[in-house]
Design a protein with these regions (language model features):
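Hydrophobic positions on the alpha1 helix immediately C-terminal to the Walker A/P-loop
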Residues: 17
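ATP-dependent small-molecule kinase phosphotransfer cores
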Residues: 33-98, 104
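ATP-dependent NMP and nucleoside kinases share a basic, alpha-helical "lid"
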Residues: 80-140
């Protein structure tokens, strides 16, 4: 099992990176975010239409911050989700599954690194043409020392090539 924290500014290619990984990795991988539950709450209880803009990003960031300060909820929720998912896998799949976890905040990333140790890797996708959003989650994306840095300034074929190289690196680790 590996937990890969994938990060980057908005629209930096995090989902595309995980999708290419899933396409080429011979074992199972899943792609989740620590903000998923907050998004569901916003849609169900606050009328959010699912479209991301500066206002909705700020709202999500603040809700996640409050939940984290209240009871470490985003982290604990994801740890529980990983544990339950892993328990339901056949034993033969548990060793090689990869959990992509989107997490923006450096202090939250560190919680995963502390919990999963050598099973946890961190990746930052960087794009030169991306504007940083107006919230603390997005503003602090670069304030962490990641294990891997992916420059996503080319086309999708270039990103896919980098994903293939990344897969080889993690197989060797």
């Amino acid at each position: 099992m590996k937990v890969i924290i994938v990060n980057g500014s908005n629209n930096s290619g995090k989902d595309q990176f995980a999708n290419f990984f899933n396409k080429h990795y011979e074992h199972k991988s899943v792609n989740w975010s620590t903000i998923d539950k907050v998004k569901k709450i916003l849609k169900r209880n606050f009328g959010w239409n699912g479209k991301k803009n500066n206002e909705s990003r700020l709202f999500m960031s603040e809700m996640k911050r409050i939940w984290s300060e209240f009871n470490n909820g985003p982290f604990e929720d994801m740890v529980t989700k990983i544990s339950k998912y892993n328990a339901n896998l056949p034993k033969s799949e548990r060793q090689n599954i990869v959990y992509f976890i989107h997490c923006r905040e450096p202090h939250e990333i560190q919680k995963f690194v502390d919990k999963y140790g050598k099973k946890c890797l961190t990746v930052l996708l960087k794009r030169e043409d991306r504007e940083v959003a107006n919230n603390d989650s997005d503003k602090n994306v670069a304030n962490y020392e990641y294990d891997f840095y992916i420059d996503n300034n080319g086309d999708k074929k270039e990103l896919e090539k980098q994903v293939l190289e990344f897969i080889e690196k993690i197989k060797a680790s």
